[in-house]
Amino acid sequence: MSLVYLMATNLLVMLIVLFTLSHRQLRKVAGYVALIAPIVTSTYFIMKIPDVIRNKFIAVRLPWMPSIDINLDLRLDGLSLMFGLIISLIGVGVFFYATQYLSHSTDNLPRFFIYLLLFMFSMIGIVIANNTILMYVFWELTSISSFLLISYWYNNGESQLGAIQSFMITVFGGLALLTGFIILYIITGTNTITDILNQRNAISRHPLFIPMILMLLLGAFTKSAQFPFHIWLPKAMAAPTPVSAYLHSATMVKAGIFLLFRFTPLLGLSNVYIYTVTFVGLITMLFGSLTALRQYDLKGILAYSTISQLGMIMTMVGLGGGYAQHTSDELSKFYILVLFAGLFHLMNHAVFKCALFMGVGIIDHESGTRDIRLLNGMRKVFPKMHIVMLLAALSMAGVPFLNGFLSKEMFLDSLTKANELDQYGFVLTFVIISIGVIASILTFTYALYMIKETFWGNYNIEKFKRKQIHEPWLFSLPAVILMLLIPVIFFVPNVFGNFVILPATRSVSGIGAEVDAFVPHISQWHGVNLPLILSIVVIIIGLILALVVNWKEVTHQIIKSASITDGYRKIYREFELYSARGIRALMNNKLNYYIMITLFIFVAIVVYGYLTVGFPHVHQLHISSFGPLEVILSVVTLIIGISLIFIRQRLTMVVLNGMIGFAVTLYFIAMKAPDLALTQLVVETITTILFIVSFSRLPNIPRVKANLKKETFKIIVSLVMALTVVSLIFVAQQADGMPSIAKFYEDAYELTGGKNIVNAILGDFRALDTMFEGLVLIIAGLGIYTLLNYKDRRGQDERE
């Protein structure tokens, strides 16, 4: 149950932060209260490292909807532990950084940290979920919380557009992911991820295997900003920098990669998956690194660099996916090397990219700009950030003595050995190496170019709006700590490799500790080999390009004619146009029109059900005994109902409608149900009175003459609806699928202590229904109250 308690702790902290919203003095400490959640979460995961290394996994399963195998199924293994550590430890730094970044006087701190806590809670849920539907719920929660965080400064138009764009693309991917999970359930009959992976060989032979893979890939590519779905990530940079440092470099964008790692033992059985992921990753890596060079905004450079680095990791996920087809032959060592390298670089990227974002945030916060055309010579003002960002950028570029060099070497080693695989010949291997090396050169170029344009050159204070610029040490602390980790990981890589990456590799492989024999030992020096030569080539050419070429002009000419963002905007505008037309066609302010649409949909669903399972048998209908009173009431009700179709006077219609309600009251009396009769009488009386009282507030609408065609159509609709309801009564009488609950009602007094069966039903047997019905009424009341207050502030308006 420890995982449940962990999630509950995060929710509790969220509630405490929510409480600070109503207290002005407490708002200032909302960030420090929120900091408790990542500290507790990271402490928990660190304490579980020894257990996971010994293959002692933590699992919790609580029934939710067991009939369709949807349960609160949580599991902590090596892969979820690694991602959990990244989410929580980076979270500690980002939460603290955010307390210094946001203004205590102008920013709504509790609201921001509630959103951030919701996101962290959702990400933890994704990585420990062992049920596909539960994972999907958390998956969409990350999209919702990301939308809220990107639009935090909602008065900014860029924030609004970025939030909508990211939400639409990631939710589209989420729906595709859900489709893939449903296909998996159709194939296997289970939603439990471990059970699904155990059936991987049977699943791979199913005709729906490839469609399922494509759906999961859509979910992963949209979430992890892979080409051509990458366009949401640069627009998301309108969010506060702590959001960019956390969501868009270290956590949310890694969710798609986590998904593919989790299902690698299954997905890797298909060459379609291997080719698609590998080449989409390479294209994304190349496109992102090239596009980063045409940016003026520091966060824009980092956004495209993140896209490029995600493409690099995705390439390794694709190359290593073939392990599912070679779990015990001579190629196993290569596949495990690639998967290990992908996990290693994922960790390294979280460290150096988060440090870069924090550095950019400090520069922007203190100087008021992120434009590299204005930021020359900033090393004189931000000496600590100069060192932090220089080391982080060089690590991203793959320079020796920094952690990025180790994983970049492993990446290049993987590319050079691709020709040993069954899926790749000499030509494909040459293409893969060429794209990988070119993208690596461009990565080195934009990394050094960013540092050169920001920190080197002549400093001119007149370019800045703020004339007093300083570098707060407390603000810089999280970035400095991350910077120190960069060389530490390089010099002691196997500490992280053995305690974090090895258990994750076991989980990805699907065979546990048996994979240990193939896991590489991370070394800083492998001798002079092809990957080292390629690294030297990357550094030399990258230095020349970064210091000599004017990349703004070059890449602007290359990319300006192929803007995917313009295509997205055109599609979005068309979507808005057709949506507006559809809304205008449906929402014509005529209540009877709305009711007919609702009834039509209801009848269509019922008819579809009958066509699918068959129509009810009329000869099996059981008709209860009835007397003269029931006959009279039925005839009176029928006459009143038909009259309502033709009558135009409001008062008469309300009175007749009330008479139908009173007739129902008499029905209840005839059936010896006095409580229901009394309730119906009171409700009907109050409703009728409220209708009549409201007449004085209603506008004068000209009386419309009766139209024979319209009235005939209304009668037909009424008859069809009546026949549908009667047919459902037939079905209810003939249904025998579920056990009777009459025994509960017979024992109502003993079970509930209630002498009134209706009270027992509402207060005990269906207590949750009653509670949620009351909650719906409360929410509706709050909505009406809000609208009335809004009207009072805006003034009286006849349309309102």
UniProtKB/Swiss-Prot annotation:
Record Pfam families? MbhD, MbhE, Proton_antipo_M, Proton_antipo_N
Residues passing through the membrane, by range: 1-21, 29-49, 78-98, 109-129, 133-153, 167-187, 209-229, 241-261, 272-292, 300-320, 336-356, 387-407, 424-444, 472-492, 528-548, 595-615, 627-647, 651-671, 676-696, 712-732, 768-788
Read off the InterPro entries from this record: CPA3_Na-H_Antiporter_A, MrpA_C/MbhD, MrpA_C/MbhE, ND/Mrp_TM, Proton_antipo_N
Gene Ontology terms describing biological process = monoatomic ion transport
- Major subcellular location class: membrane
Coiled-coil-forming residues are: none
Q: Where is this protein found?
A: Cell membrane
Gene Ontology, cellular component aspect:
plasma membrane
Entry protein name: Putative antiporter subunit mnhA2
Which molecular-function annotations from GO does this UniProt entry contain?
Answer: antiporter activity
Taxonomic superkingdom:
Bacteria
- Keyword terms of this UniProt record: Antiport, Cell membrane, Ion transport, Membrane, Transmembrane, Transmembrane helix, Transport
State the membrane topology: Multi-pass membrane protein
| NCBIfam families found in the cross-reference section | PRK12646.1
What is annotated about its quaternary structure and interactions?
May form a heterooligomeric complex that consists of seven subunits: mnhA2, mnhB2, mnhC2, mnhD2, mnhE2, mnhF2 and mnhG2.
- Keyword Hydrolase included in the entry's annotation: no
Q: Which family does it belong to?
A: Belongs to the CPA3 antiporters (TC 2.A.63) subunit A family.
